Design a protein with these regions (language model features):
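C-terminal, active-site-flanking charged/polar segments
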Residues: 359, 434-478
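Charged, amphipathic alpha-helical linkers/stalks
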Residues: 459-518
Length: 538
């Protein structure tokens, strides 16, 4: 009964954990790394066709985005997730595949001119569609038994529509252990979706720590703040452009704007138009509406019971085609434009920035995190000029940020979630946080709650039956392109060899009870291998 850490260890993205139990290989999350990448990830040490099934906490690409990649390499098992997560992954994994293929086409077009070898995308649309067909939707709080000796339950994590913490119970012979994977724990009092649900019993916890070193501070009145920004912008005769993540944040903005319109908080601009210009956001908004009864909070359900759609209103315009998108910029009336991507590095938002950044009447409002190196980050840090489509654009528009808006719990929310366990777990593994943040939050859990904690690096292997670390990996820093990659390759090769060693132990245990003559032949093979490579005399 082993837990192996693969991704989002001392890093925020690329969540992936491997459970080896009951003769099965199980993945919990299979995410794609996004943004800065500081450490090498250990490879999954089994053939991907030998993965029995995947348990998925939620649809964000840093948790789900590599599912098509493992499908491309042989995985054909079911992916268990909540119903809403299954539906969101249908659109998000197809969108991710489109991006992979578009990037590969662009790089190959450029590379051919330079004589470079062909760039192969991580996966194709066929791979995405293949794994999407294998999703199995599960209701919240219903126990499922995907394999003998293994049961699981999805509990609302309050982070995104359909997001979940996963309670995994494993029974091997006379040993039973309960492992809770927190997933991404949501912020309280988010619009539309419910607050995180607490769990109370676990032998082991694998816990995120995204904001494990900071507080969001006091939450502003978002409706009041947004209405004031709209009022000031429209009074200048300008447009309000909101770069927004297509899934989650866009629907929150629609929720706020519906209330602003219903309460008449913007004066002199009755019936103002709101354009949502993102095909992915439009599909996601439909899915939100389809899952209102299992995912929406009390306030949203009160509106629905009154016959009010909490994320729709008069004046809402949906752009589907590229012609729809282009026509927005011919509308001379003051308006709100919500478009992806949220960090302004891709998508239709770049066209809207080109048409609106130069005009001092307009406002660009950021409602989400802007990573270092993105166009969005440059704008909030005061760039006077930026490049769009290879052309310089002067920044004259007002640049604003909506503070404190986050789908992640802050350090206090994380501690509240951890405090809910009625008995101390045997171990808490702190993951999904920046390098030092994981260590800081692990120490707080120890100092304030008395928990035995560990912030593992990728490649760490833990025996859950005996509560002992079998192998504690060291973080292997990714070398910059200008540096020699020799040391990195050596470290990666050793980690791979070590992982195969642990796999060999698993294979040996599987052969218990086989005929003696087969065991003797197996022993000779292993002995020969050890004799060949034993370096103790060198």
């Amino acid at each position: 009964m082993k837990l192996r850490f693969i991704g989002a260890d001392h890093e925020v993205t690329g969540s992936c954990h491997l459970i080896e139990a009951c003769g099965k290989n199980i993945l919990v999350d299979c995410g794609m790394e996004q943004g800065p990448d500081y450490y090498e990830n250990a490879e999954i040490p089994v053939a991907l066709g030998e993965i029995e099934f995947v348990l998925l906490t939620h649809a964000h690409i840093d948790h789900s985005g590599n599912l098509p990649a493992i499908y491309a390499k042989g995985f054909r098992g079911p992916v268990y997730a909540t119903d809403a997560t299954s539906h969101l992954c249908d659109i998000m994994l197809r969108d991710s595949a489109h991006i992979q293929m578009f990037e590969a086409e662009w790089r190959n077009r450029k590379g051919r001119r330079q004589g470079k070898p062909e760039f192969v995308p991580a996966y194709t649309m066929e791979d995405a569609m293949g794994v999407i067909r294998n999703f199995v939707g599960c209701p919240y709080n219903k126990m499922i038994t995907p394999a003998e000796g293994i049961s699981a339950r999805f509990i609302d994590a309050g982070h995104l529509l359909g997001s979940a913490s996963i309670e995994l119970t494993i029974r091997e012979e006379d040993t039973e252990k309960k492992i809770v994977f927190s997933g991404d724990i949501g912020n309280t009092c988010q619009p539309l979706i419910k607050d995180p649900e607490y769990l109370h019993h676990a032998d082991y916890i694998v816990m995120e720590s995204t904001y494990g070193d900071r507080s969001h501070g006091e939450k502003p009145d978002y409706v009041k703040l947004l209405s004031e920004i709209i009022q000031e912008t429209f009074d200048r005769g300008g447009n309000l452009v909101i770069p927004s993540f297509a899934v989650g944040r866009t629907q929150e903005m629609l929720y706020f704007i519906r209330q602003i319109k219903a309460d008449g908080l913007v004066y002199g601009h009755d019936g103002f138009k709101v354009y949502v210009d993102s095909p992915l956001a439009n599909e996601a908004t439909t899915i939100f509406s389809e899952h209102q009864y299992d995912c929406f909070d009390e306030e949203a359900m009160e509106l629905i019971q009154k016959g009010i759609n909490p994320i729709s209103f008069p004046g809402l315009k949906i752009s589907v085609t590229s012609d729809d998108s282009k026509s927005i910029n011919y509308d001379e009336e003051p308006k709100v434009i919500i478009s992806a991507s949220g960090m302004c590095d891709a998508g239709r938002i770049k066209h809207h920035l080109k048409h609106n950044l130069w005009n001092e009447k307009n406002t660009i409002l950021f409602v989400g995190y802007q990573a270092v190196g993105t166009l969005g980050r440059a704008l909030i840090e005061g760039a006077a000029d930026v490049k769009l489509f290879g052309e310089p654009v002067h920044v004259a528009a007002h640049i604003c940020q909506m503070p404190g808006i986050s789908g992640h719990a802050d350090v206090n929310g994380l501690l509240d979630w951890a405090k809910a366990f009625e008995e101390k777990p045997q171990k808490v593994f702190v993951t999904h946080g920046d390098d030092t943040v994981t260590e800081i939050f692990a120490k707080r859990l120890t100092d304030e709650l008395g928990y035995d904690t560990m912030a593992p690096f990728s490649g760490t292997v833990y025996d859950l039956a005996d509560n002992v670390c079998l192998y504690e990996a060291k973080g292997v820093k990714i070398q910059k392109a200008s540096a020699s990659p020799k040391a990195t390759r050596a470290a990666r090769a050793f980690e791979k060899l070590l992982a195969l060693g642990y796999r060999l132990i698993t294979v040996i245990r599987k052969n218990e009870g086989t005929p003696n003559k087969d065991l003797e032949r197996f022993s000779r093979d292993v002995q020969s291998l050890c004799d060949k490579w034993d370096r103790t005399d060198m």
